[in-house]
Amino acid sequence: EVGGVKAKLDEDGHEAVVLEQLEIDWKFSNNPLQTADNELQARIIVREVFRENGLDVTFNAKPIIGVAGSGEHTHFGVMAKLKSGKLVNLFSPEDMRKESASSLGIGAIMGLLKHYEAINPFISSTTDSLNRLKPGFEAPVCIVTSLGTDPSEPSRNRTILCGLIRDIDNPMATRYELRSPNPYTNTY
């Protein structure tokens, strides 16, 4: 069983139809255009591999009513390259143990939340994508965020719109995860 969908077996116990959700992760790119290209390329590869094996695949946000939908959580952060060549994560605070995010990082999340109603039509542009954003399926249902109760422990609330992702020992890992996109969101 994956995402609340049970595999369909025939009377001999052989799989007749398998319904599963697969999660695909890849390393981020410092180039936003390359990141969008990677996402599109991954979708094409998955579709072709399934087709070559006689299987169907869908990237719909809510292919089956009553079970968890398909999200495409998008992580974003901002880095600067100093004259010395060193990369600095602009969302990381100076003291990772005392603060959750830098003032720029807090400003970024505040701007996203404030303007999300204007941004959302580009993210959730179909009825199918809006069907995914319902209570009870670990999808965002409100325009809210949570940075966690303590800088050492970010929130893992799966119903928030945008969450803070960080590693207290790695300032370069600080970023936000926007949870509302789906596989048909235009990443570009």
Give, region by region, the residue ranges found by the protein language model.
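Active-site capping/gating regions of soluble enzymes
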Residues: 1-3, 10-12, 16-188
